[in-house]
Each structure stands twice: as structure tokens, then as C-alpha cells.
From Swiss-Prot:
Primary location group: membrane
Chain's role: Produces ATP from ADP in the presence of a proton gradient across the membrane. The gamma chain is believed to be important in regulating ATPase activity and the flow of protons through the CF(0) complex.
Protein name: ATP synthase gamma chain
Gene this protein is translated from: atpG
An example Gene Ontology biological process: proton motive force-driven plasma membrane ATP synthesis
Record's signal peptide: none
Keywords: ATP synthesis, Cell inner membrane, Cell membrane, CF(1), Hydrogen ion transport, Ion transport, Membrane, Transport
GO molecular function, a single term: ATP binding
């Protein structure tokens, strides 16, 4: 059995770790709330823009934008959003698994894959895997902006415009609740038809557009893709913080259990030492 001093040193060390994980849990909770606010604001903006796009696209039947037209697939692109830091449980690896499976299916169908990765964890993983990473971005911090993402998004949009890729997807964690974060792969281009497009087209519309509908649609579609990527980043950030909060809470609780176990061992060691001393005293008294 370890000595009393050694056990007490271990208890002190675990208590220090418990303080750190407890502080990290509180910081993650605070950051999660801020990320949720950004996520909700961005979602409302993206939904409104999608309605406008649906209205204009259905109103201009003679104009067929490339972002709205299906084409034969020989190469696809994925924008992968991960965290920059660890200590967030299995958040990143659970996101990468379905993408790796999708890449395997593409390979079997002789469809090539290009990746644009956002977040150092995705960059490290897919570069190590030998994937074709055409763009990477990291170090966005806790308050990313759309401007931070434009470069990576433009590379993929240019590839789509030039016919180098025929379909574009976004891969990120979807924030369902504080207890559920779901890895998702969603199609960005060609823009999937929304359920409410027909209703939007038939409803009364109170907007007056300045300029040609074609020019507005060209601009809006690019902004919409950028907003979807930004939405994915802030949503993934909220998932990262809630996962870190849960991981740190678990670590704090485990530290508490370990302290209790070590305290029990320390008490037993002390009891054993006292019993031995009493036995020696009794033996000495009997000898006299």
C-alpha cells in the first residue's frame, strides 16, 4: 500500500486538475450560449434568403442558373467543418466517419473527391489520410465572420463554375440540443428544391427589385452558399462548446470519484498505521 504522504500528494494533484476542468466547463458553457445566439441569427437570415431565391428562380423560368441545374457527376466537392481544438469528446471523429464512408463509395463509382477543410482537426485528419485537400482554413476563433470563410468558399465555387466539380456538399455537426449533436452531410450545389418554393411563388410578394432578376439571382446564390457555410461554422462551434462542456463535466465528476477513492485508501493506511502502533505498545507493555 502507498504511504500516507504519497496518497495525499495524489489527492492534491487530482484536486488541482478538478479545479481546472471545472473552470473549463464554465467557460465552455458561456461560449456555447454566445455561439447559439450567432447560430440562431444566421439561421433566420439564411431562411429569408432562401425564400427570395426560390421566388426569383421560379419567376424567371427562362433563366437557368448553373447552381440550380443538375449535371452528370464525375467529381464532387466537400466543405468540411471541424474544430481547431480538442477536449470535445468524439465530436470530430464522429463527423469524419460518414464522410470517409461517402468518399469510399465515390471511389468505387470512379467519382473523384476534392475537400476544402475548415478547422485544424479536419486538416490534420484528411491530409494524413492522403485526401485531395484543395483549400484549408483554421484559427477562426470563437467569433468567426463570413469574411474569414470567403476564400475557401470561392475556391469551391470557382471549381463548380469551371465544371471541375459537379456537386458540392457541406459537412458539419448539427446542433439539435445540448444533449444531441448530429453529424450531417448536406448538398449545397446544385441548390436542392425547398419544400416551400411553390408556396412562395404563389403567395403575394411585397418586394420590388432594383435591377434585372438574373443579376440579383447571380449575386444571391453566391451569398446564400457563403451564408450556409457560415451557418455550418457557427453551428459546429456551438456543438464543439457543448461537447467540451460535457467532457469537462465528466472529467470533473471523475476527479471527484477518484478523490473519494484516494481518501478511502488514505484512511485505511492511517488506520493500519495506528493499529500497528497500538500493537507495538501493547507488546512492549506485556514484555515489561
Amino acid at each position: 500500500m502507498a504511504g500516507d504522504k504519497e496518497i495525499r500528494n495524489k489527492i492534491a494533484s487530482v484536486k488541482n486538475t478538478q479545479k481546472i476542468t471545472g473552470a473549463m466547463e464554465m467557460v465552455a458553457a458561456s461560449k456555447m450560449r454566445r455561439a447559439q445566439l450567432r447560430m440562431n441569427s444566421s439561421l433566420s437570415y439564411a431562411k429569408s434568403m432562401r425564400k427570395v431565391i426560390g421566388h426569383i428562380a421560379l419567376g424567371e423560368l427562362e433563366y437557368h442558373h448553373a447552381y440550380l441545374e443538375e449535371r452528370e457527376i464525375s467529381r464532387v466537392g466537400y466543405i468540411v467543418i471541424s474544430s481547431d481544438r480538442g477536449l470535445c469528446g468524439g465530436l470530430n471523429i464522429n463527423l469524419f466517419k460518414p464522410l470517409v464512408a461517402a468518399m469510399k463509395k465515390h471511389s468505387e463509382a470512379n467519382v473523384e473527391v476534392d475537400l476544402a477543410v475548415i478547422g485544424s482537426k479536419a486538416a490534420t485528419f484528411f491530409n494524413g489520410l492522403g485526401a485531395n485537400v484543395v483549400a484549408q482554413n483554421s484559427g477562426l476563433g470563437d467569433a468567426p465572420s463570413v469574411n474569414d470563410l470567403i476564400g475557401s468558399v470561392k475556391i469551391m465555387l470557382d471549381a463548380y463554375d469551371e465544371g471541375k466539380i459537379d456537386r458540392l456538399f457541406i459537412v458539419n455537426n448539427k446542433f439539435i440540443s445540448t444533449m444531441v449533436q448530429e453529424p450531417t452531410i448536406s448538398q449545397l450545389l446544385p441548390l436542392p428544391k425547398a419544400e416551400g418554393d411553390k408556396e412562395v411563388a404563389s403567395d403575394s410578394w411585397d418586394y420590388i427589385y432594383e435591377g434585372e432578376a438574373k443579376d440579383i439571382l447571380d449575386s444571391l446564390l453566391v451569398r446564400y452558399v457563403e451564408s450556409q457555410v457560415y451557418q455550418g461554422v457557427v453551428e459546429n462551434l456551438a456543438c464543439e462548446q457543448v461537447s467540451r462542456m460535457i467532457a469537462m463535466k465528466s472529467a470533473t465528476d471523475n476527479a471527484g470519484d477518484m478523490i473519494d477513492e484516494l481518501q478511502l485508501v488514505a484512511n485505511k493506511a492511517r488506520q493500519s498505521a495506528i493499529t500497528q502502533e497500538l500493537s507495538e505498545i501493547c507488546s512492549g507493555a506485556a514484555a515489561v
